[in-house]
């Protein structure tokens, strides 16, 4: 999708790829049933089954290098607000920790994040040397390191 900061390709499934004469990226799921196990709906392309390459910064060092921020363990309810511009909205509602002067000072409250994906990608300041599986409902897991993003506005909910 993105390689060395350059946009290379979109999510695709075999159905859309065949229509466009391209190779599928393996990012398909079926909607309309629990656990995505119905064969009735047409597969849609979705952001899952993605691997983000590790960087060289530990999560501990990212925290030490943060004056004021949040450590977010999981995002919920991520929706495209304006798909053309890449604007999205999501909720961080569990596993939030407050970072002050390079130290975790306690748990945080749920917040709403409304941002632009292109701007968020420009504001990545470090990528962790760790890897973890992230599962979106019944999808195949994505594999991602810790990612530190600067200048994200959050609203309490």
Region annotations inferred by a language model:
Residues 1-157:
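Dual-mode signal for accessory low-complexity, basic/Gly-rich regions
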